[in-house]
Amino acid sequence: MKKGKRYIQLDYPRLTRLGSWLQQSWFPALGSWFLILGFLGCTHPFDIQENTPAGNVAALWQIIDEKYCFVEEKDIDWDALRAPYITRAEAIDPDAEDAHFQLFDLMEEMLNHLHDGHVNLYTPFDISVCRTWYEGYPSCYNAALHRQYLANARYVGGMYYTTLADDSIGYIYYGSFQSSFSATNLYYILSSFKDCRGLILDVRQNGGGSLDYAYRLAATFIDHDTLVGYWQHKRGTGHNDFSDPEPLYVRTEDMRNKWLRPTIVLQDRHSYSATNSFVSAMRYMPNVLLLGGVSGGGGGMPMSYELPNGWTVRFSSVKMYNAEGNSIEEGVPPHILDSLPANPTQDNLIEHAIQIINHAYDNSTH
């Protein structure tokens, strides 16, 4: 079996009490099934920790220390966090009525040092969320303005689609890569744009979902297989213990569904996870420009582990790179940086995209 020639979905249940699973992620087929089994079997028994506040914090710290893939890249002094957080956990009275809240808040605080939207602590009463990866970035989206452009849109396969600028430009808004679509859906969408000069593909506020859907959509914009990046997984407990890079390809799909005319992809800081991988891949598609803000990142595929008390921590365990070998964890910059003004009266990213397509059309031989 040749590397990178097809994709295998890994959707395994939790393997052990400290097992793991990959969520909504697709990997290229590896050189042999033994490599896949080796990856799945890389989980080993951690130091046995007591089911106490301090024991759970120690277990959480060790899981991140040994399995999280961005400790070195983000220059995090993870070692320095262990003792202070365990000491604070030891001060929690396990018999206190709010002990579970105290422990949760302490763990969430520790995890937020990672600044990673793929890192979550799941409990029966709350889920931790990191927001630092998108806070403080300029706005590229206004929901009220956006609705005006969708007034006459049709909807199928998770995509709103319509035409703009006197029916001369196609427009698609895809709000989540969790929404499935078929080749037939794409056929009807693209057929409705047959007389259009170009296409605006809007993935702002798209927080991700299936990497398979992301690459299937990207395949619409190429007529040949295209290398778009690489991935690596942890293979040891050291912060830099990774497998060799494996290539990621976007493969040509149904040849009926090809769009090779000018295309503008709109992105913002909330374009995260699978959407981040999508815009990274689209940089290698002909006739495509990225417009908007730096995407949100989330260039690590997630894995989950269970703590002694039954809570689950999810974190990034597989690193993804672009075709030049650069990490996409911190986001993908657009070709043209743009944002909404403080008091917008129109969606100027959409209007800017229309201008770019019209300019390209006016300066072409048609």
Briefly describe each language-model feature range.
Residues 1-50, 365-366:
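Bacterial Sec-dependent N-terminal signal peptides
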Residues 1-7, 88-93, 320:
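Short regulatory "switch" loops immediately downstream of catalytic or recognition motifs
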Residues 41-233, 240-247, 262, 304, ...:
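Flexible, low-complexity junctional segments that flank or bridge functional domains
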Residues 43-64, 207-366:
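C-terminal "post-core" interaction segments
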